[in-house]
Amino acid sequence: MMIQKKVGDRIRELRTQTGLSQEKFALKIGIDRTYFASVELGKRNIAIVNLEKIADGLNVSLSDLFKGL
C-alpha cells in the first residue's frame, strides 16, 4: 500500500474518533474540504504544514499520525 493511502487511512481513523465530518474538520483546520477528502483517500501528497494543521486539529502529535504505518 502506498504511504499516502496509509497516512490518509490513519487521518480518517483519528478524525472519525472526533465525531467530525470531513467538512466540519476541514473548516476547523482551515483546509479546503475537497483537498482534505483527497488526502484521506490517499490521492494527494500532503505538505508538512498541512500535516501539522491536521495533527493540531486532532490534538495529536505528528508522530501519532504515523503510528502503525
Predicted region positions:
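Short alpha-helical DNA-recognition segment
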Residues: 19-38
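Alpha-helical residues within the helix-turn-helix
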Residues: 16, 27, 56
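A short, Lys/Arg-rich alpha-helix, primarily the initiator
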Residues: 1-17
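Short, charged recognition helix plus adjacent turn
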Residues: 66-69
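DNA major-groove recognition helix of helix-turn-helix/homeodomain DNA-binding modules
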Residues: 50-64
